[in-house]
Amino acid sequence: MSTFPPTLLDAMRDVNALLQAGDLRLAHEQLATIVEENPECVEALRLLAGTRQARGDIEGAETLLRKALALDPNWTPTLATLGELLLGSGRSDEAEPMLRRAAQRLPRAALVLARHCNDQQRPAEALALVAPLCVGGQADAEWVTQHVAALAALGRQDEAVAFYRRLAEASPDNLAATHAMAIALDAAGRPAEARRAASHVLARGHRTAAIHFTHARSLIALGEFDRAEAALRDCLRLEPRLADAHSHLARLVWMRSGDSAQTTATLDQALQAFPRDDALWAAKAAILQGAGDAKSAYACLATQAAQAQAPPALLVRAGLAALDFDPATARALAERALRASPSSAARSLLAAALLGIGDARGALDECETLLAGAPDDQYLIALQTTAWRLLGDERHLAFCDYAQLVLPQQLQAPAPWPDLASFLADLKRSLERLHDPHGHPLLFQSLRHGTETTEDLIRNADPVIQALFLAFDTPIRNYLAHIGHGSDPLRRRNEGSYRFNGSWSVRLRTRGYHDNHVHPRGWVSSAFYVDLPDNLAASNHDGCLAFGEPGIATVPALPARHVVHPEPGMLVLFPSYFWHGTVPFASEQARLTVAFDVLPDTRREHA
């Protein structure tokens, strides 16, 4: 890019000062004048595009950025800005090449691309982008989060902890390194250590939105909800547009109040201040849908979605809400999003919507396109098998052989307990301490009328819970031997080894149940029964685990195909792509379970 003449340089400095002060209106006016007088000033075009985008004119911003790129195809900031805009619009096929070019010179571009790769379950690519920039211990929280997320997705959480612990211990005054260690500890399911590290950073006066957010996450995992809420509010005072923090705060408020208005109150204040922030609107829609109010979720996006130039990502979010009650509208929104950008999120929505309007053949075509690029996505496999079932395709019977692939086993009492009953009694006491006796169901989860724990139980220090997960090893290995090897999505990944990938406990009260769902990022999933109501009878299905009824609308509707009657001490293992849910029951006693997912253990490759 050519050097600015002195008068233009002064004008650009004035614009930068306005942008830093947050005066977008005046900055936009001055940039428009600069571009009119200097139509070949690439950086002015880029900044003007930024102000256009901030004002909601995505199409105008893209036009300006493409003009700037035509003037100087190698100006890295333009490549990065246009790539990020396209990515935000769901046009990843166009965005990724630009961001890869920009990432060679601009760390921000590498960060944006790494976040996208992690979101798309491509952790190895994300790791290659961020690891080189995290070695010095000065990377900010966004970098560290993506680095740790990539390692965690690869099953290398402990490696992330060891890496950042070395950096923190080598430079005790480097608070960024200590914060990075806290992020790694949180991702590894070690919340007590993460809390200590985050508290140390805060005590030293390093009070950023990011450290408050890390602190809050560790407190949530430890069940310290009042302190976690305070930390999230501190975070949002510093960064009121942080959608992740709003989502976490909403979870906390909802699980203790069950009131939608209270749950979104802080987010509503942010939306009053930033009414054009699509990420905040999408967060609100997700929260409302997670609270079971899909129609309100759709309503809060309907005005934006009706606009001709609505961003594809917003159309998809609105479509996900509509999918619960109006698949035809969801289909229309998905098709609009796909016309703007061929994103996997829009295509996945379209596949589900087509099942809801009776077009199983069309849904199958979309699934096969998506599975070519993401063969292990359990939700896509569930959509594919649902389409096969509707079409009478024999492949459904092979992939969904419930009699063969759903395996109940009775757990053996671990030492030193003399029998299973005494172990389950101790386990019940340990788990009940983790459940809020007055809590509401978590947002974004399948359960209704019950509570779910917030920490990863695998990392819980309680010796009874530790004994439980050691006792799971034999039945898991029995299951892997039972299913054997093959070319289907379950068996082709079976190398005889596994690692846990999340675990939790659920306590259902009377009328409690799980909506039908799958575990999108699992491989093998589970249900272990700790305590059951006395009045559950073998003569009916109340409180049973049911398989095969989709969690989305289909035409025609599909009933459950397989039912397991639970017993205390029973562990049921099954493919994560199986639709499954719990039949409601009526009892004064609670139904207490533990669940976990496992993935194939590929960590030996990195030993």
Give the location of each predicted region:
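Residue-level recognition of tetratricopeptide repeat
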Residues: 7, 41, 75, 106-109, ...
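Register position in tetratricopeptide repeats
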Residues: 20, 54, 88, 119, ...
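Canonical positions in the second alpha-helix
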Residues: 33-34, 67-68, 98-102, 132-133, ...
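TPR alpha-solenoid repeat register
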Residues: 44, 78, 109, 143, ...
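Canonical tetratricopeptide repeat
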Residues: 47, 81, 112-115, 146, ...
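Non-heme Fe(II)/2-oxoglutarate
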Residues: 398-490, 513
